[in-house]
Amino acid sequence: MSKVIGIDLGTTNSCVAVYERGESKVIPNKEGKNTTPSVVAFTDKGEVLVGDSAKRQAVTNPEKTIYSIKRIMGLMINEDAAKEAKNRLPYHITERNGACAIEIAGKIYTPQEISAKVLMKLKEDAEAFLGESVVDAVITVPAYFNDAQRKATKEAGTIAGLNVLRIINEPTSAALAYGLDKKDSEKIVVYDLGGGTFDVTVLETGDNVVEVLATGGNAFLGGDDFDNKLIDFLANEFKDETGIDLKNDVMALQRLKEAAENAKKELSSANETEINLPFITADASGPKHLVKKLTRAKFEGMIDSLVAETITKINEVVSDAGLKKDEIKEIVMVGGSTRVPLVQEEVKKAFNKDLNKSVNPDEVVAIGAAIQGAVIKGDVKDVLLLDVTPLSLGIETLGGVMTKIIEKGTTIPTKKEQVFSTAEDNQSAVTINVLQGEREFSRDNKSLGNFNLEGIPPAPRGMPQIEVTFDIDANGILTVSAKDKATGKAQEIKITGSSGLSEEEINNMVKDAELHKEEDKKRKEAVDARNAADSLAHQVEKSLSELGEKVAAADKENIQKALDDLRETLKNQNASKEEIESKMKALSEVSHKLAENMYKKDEPNTANDKKKKDDDVIDAEVE
């Protein structure tokens, strides 16, 4: 069995790790960095850029640069979080089968396809580092991700050509990395605040067991929201001063986003920073510049309500675990946004305890995922990971009520059955509406999908017995079945529609990704050939210039023709590697002939020079 990689597919950055020779370690990308920006860009030339190269050109290409795609993963277009994302993000969010999608240059991409491009880069970087093909992976998700979001993440892995062995919760993964070597049992809290999501999880670790006691969070709260508070502040101040709304200018908005992100990072170590954006926009009076000094205190005032929300969630989750705060031994901080001083201060204050910063917040989740991969593969023995479902699952019953079948906090994998009946006399079919959430009424919870059980024999209401079974696998993904106990007729639904993609669509996307992989390879080869051709043409032109009149007219004409042919081919942006190399070969051949001719011309002169020098030598006799 080949190596299993662990992937932290983050909102802002992603990380990949592998377990080998008894330890889990982060795999650097081809740029030499341990994390890769979760950014994908489409250029006007048809190139697809991923990671640092995509992030670098975001300001000049805002509408075709996709970031924070995780925030709309598995979302339906009519959900509030989707509406918020449409208002915030510069690229065009549309829908496909009712689920969120992205439109770029007239083509629709799902969040799964965009995320797959990030995963493909991580896969390729891992293969380059390990020197072997990689297929199997463990991918992490926020603990509070619902079924649709988990399913969409797994689909992204499939599209990227990965065999996703397990979907694992990020805080659980971090605890696995942190607690694997702990012999004594201890209760810990993992506070995970990333770019777009927040989770807090209470776990018990020790003696190679990692057990989740309770988990909670917000799948739409993270460092992006800190940035957005600062973006709003800067845009509003600028509008008050100039009357210009920068939010209507996608390029200005992208510059604001970069400036806000940098200011946030600087204020983690400095008490004041200056945001300086020259030529941010212009009006009839001329160009406008944005220059603003910002103190840490001012920034903390903007985000204090968001941080307070995370502290409230801490209290809820510790209570759900049946514990008091003084029973918590360690608070492990995970996610890049935990570097914000206010976050650290408030979490420390909440527990009245120093925080554990021994783990790298950007890397620990991937490291834990790699350990889980090694457990599945059998390289790590006797490790037991007991995770839980973050939200209750049930069905809609009479009166629009949600009847829970699996309560939140239930250890997974799990399987539970419950018997229901008909609501009307002679009812021949029942509709099973599968729900996820904690509210009393079905309309206030998320519908994951529905299906019909038909062919129920006529009977008074309340008589037929319909057995509904909920089965959650180790990935937290749900299968629901219903069976009429009298006839044995059954119907099953694997909750797939909630992610917006059918199995056929996923298979098509896998093929499409493979096709584009080959296209990208050819495009890269053409770029390399183009660079080599430019270099050759420059060298030949330089040689012609230096040799001047020494070059015979016929040779010069042949070389110039080959040069012109090559230059003409290079003007065609779609020229293939083979076309370019053919013209390069022709130029190389005539250039070599020139070199041979020049060498032959020089040979007699060299011999005469040598003879002349010999004639000038006076023989000396030595006694």
Curated annotation (Swiss-Prot):
Residues 595-615 have a biased composition (Basic and acidic residues). The keyword Lyase does not apply. InterPro entries: ATPase_NBD, Chaperone_DnaK, Heat_shock_70_CS, HSP70_C_sf, HSP70_peptide-bd_sf, Hsp_70_fam. The keyword Magnesium does not apply. Induction: By stress conditions e.g. heat shock. Residues 595-623 are annotated as: Disordered. Acts as a chaperone. This is Chaperone protein DnaK.
